[in-house]
Amino acid sequence: MKKIVLYGGQFNPIHTAHMIVASEVFHELQPDEFYFLPSFMSPLKKHNNFIDVQHRLTMIQMIIDELGFGDICDDEIKRGGQSYTYDTIKAFKEQHKDSELYFVIGTDQYNQLEKWYQIEYLKEMVTFVVVNRDKNSQNVENAMIAIQIPRVDISSTMIRQRVSEGKSIQVLVPKSVENYIKGEGLYEH
């Protein structure tokens, strides 16, 4: 049975902390396949500074190239509108019947899982991998996996704000992503 990891997020933009999460999960679980799953629009997040989806996909591919593993699953992008993880996983599972699916979330998402659409069915379809960036270890439900990673206080919101203020984002994102953001004039308004 294939082991497949799905790492969802807006990735607007993808950054160094996302790379650390991907790397830690990849090396801990050693999956056969690893997918970055960019959302079109998350139902639980505000949508400020939204850029053309192609920019996000390009930056994710740059991260994949740098990490040396992973692919992009753009199912939610193709669907458009609000993305519910349940719908995405259900469709993905139909395409990958003989696979064990692992879905990466942070402790912030873990703490609001009860708000997720069809969460009980979703728990039957995937094993949640809860990534904790805090000093204290996270207690998770028995059917879930907790992975502790180094705390890195970087957020996409911070990066967008720094760019709009003309501040440096060096090392917050890989050089290729930094150059792309500058070259395309992203987040400057």
Curated annotation (Swiss-Prot):
Disulfide bonds: none annotated. GO terms for biological process: NAD biosynthetic process. Keywords: ATP-binding, NAD, Nucleotide-binding, Nucleotidyltransferase, Pyridine nucleotide biosynthesis, Transferase. GO terms for molecular function: ATP binding; nicotinate-nucleotide adenylyltransferase activity. It catalyses: nicotinate beta-D-ribonucleotide + ATP + H(+) = deamido-NAD(+) + diphosphate. Its EC number is 2.7.7.18. Pathway: Cofactor biosynthesis; NAD(+) biosynthesis; deamido-NAD(+) from nicotinate D-ribonucleotide: step 1/1. Belongs to the NadD family. This is Probable nicotinate-nucleotide adenylyltransferase. It comes from Staphylococcus aureus (strain JH9).
